[in-house]
């Protein structure tokens, strides 16, 4: 896992043959990773399909195979980095959300309200409040780059959701779902940093480092 706050999701280390230079917070900022007692700096994955969220989940599932199959209790602390910056995600995940954020503030707002009603999370008597014109105008002025950034962020959360699902599926496969307490927590809030080291590139790729 990662010892510091964030790193490139596709390649935390140095450039691999045939690939672009992995973007970093600064040119000489090589983040340390560890595996058990071994610290790796740089950590350059040999797998070209490496993605941090997937890799952390792979280790969690392996741990459950090793320690969760017996009668002894187990404790798994699974600390994902996503959706912390940099904004990087698989293209197939980004594609799911690109059109969703391009429809505009009013339409997004209406769809979210309809979804809350569909899920039964709010009473139909709770109407959708009048829109704040300032918010709509602010959203309209964001531009295509910000809309793409929102799609990438959503894609990172989507992959995180897939990963948590894999862990829960493994617990079920082991027959431990009725005897396992699962707690999900999230820290931080909105990003307080503005980092656009690669303004000429769209967010999401290995050579792009943006918040």
Each model region followed by its residue ranges:
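Surface-exposed helix-capping loop/turn segments at secondary-structure junctions
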Residues: 66-74, 123, 166-179
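Beta-strand elements within well-structured catalytic alpha/beta cores of enzymes
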Residues: 60, 74-80, 153, 157-160, ...
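Short, solvent-exposed beta-strand-terminating loops
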Residues: 6, 123, 189
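Generic, well-ordered alpha-helical scaffold segments in large soluble proteins
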Residues: 63, 115, 119, 156-159, ...
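Residue-level detector of family-conserved "landmark" positions at structurally sensitive sites
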Residues: 126-127, 181
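Histidine-centered active-site microenvironments of extracellular/periplasmic hydrolases
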Residues: 88-89, 169-211
């Amino acid at each position: 896992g990662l010892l510091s706050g964030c790193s490139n999701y596709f390649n935390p280390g140095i450039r691999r043959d045939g690939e672009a230079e992995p973007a970093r917070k600064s040119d000489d900022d090589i983040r340390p990773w560890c595996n058990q007692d071994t610290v790796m700096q740089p950590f350059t994955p040999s797998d070209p399909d490496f993605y941090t969220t997937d890799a952390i989940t792979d280790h969690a599932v392996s741990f459950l195979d090793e320690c969760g199959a017996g009668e002894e209790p187990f404790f798994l602390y699974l600390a994902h980095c996503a959706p912390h910056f940099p904004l990087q995600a698989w293209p197939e995940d980004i594609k799911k959300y690109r059109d969703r954020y391009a429809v505009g503030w009013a339409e997004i707002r209406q769809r979210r309200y309809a979804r809350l009603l569909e899920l039964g999370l709010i009473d139909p008597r709770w109407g959708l409040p009048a829109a704040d014109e300032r918010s709509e105008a602010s959203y309209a002025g964001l531009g295509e780059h910000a809309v793409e950034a929102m799609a990438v962020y959503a894609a990172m959360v989507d992959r995180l959701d897939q990963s948590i699902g894999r862990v829960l599926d493994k617990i079920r496969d082991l027959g431990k779902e009725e005897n396992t307490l699962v707690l999900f927590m999230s820290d931080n809030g909105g990003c307080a940093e503005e980092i656009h080291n690669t303004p000429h590139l769209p967010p999401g790729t290995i050579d792009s480092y943006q918040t």
